[in-house]
Each structure stands twice: as structure tokens, then as C-alpha cells.
From Swiss-Prot:
InterPro entries: Ribosomal_bL32, Ribosomal_zn-bd. This is Large ribosomal subunit protein bL32. Gene3D superfamilies: Single helix bin. GO terms for molecular function: structural constituent of ribosome. It comes from the Bacteria. GO terms for cellular component: large ribosomal subunit. Keywords: Ribonucleoprotein, Ribosomal protein. It comes from Brevundimonas vesicularis. Belongs to the bacterial ribosomal protein bL32 family.
Amino acid sequence: CVPKRKVSPSXRNMRXAHDXLT
């Protein structure tokens, strides 16, 4: 995943962000 705006929980973006990170 690509960090767009740090790690802001936003609907489906949350999964992405978390996938990425972990």
C-alpha cells in the first residue's frame, strides 16, 4: 500500500493503509 495521508481511518482506505503498514 502507499501512504497517502499518514494513517487516517477513512472507510475503505483504512484497510489499505493497515495492509500496507503491516
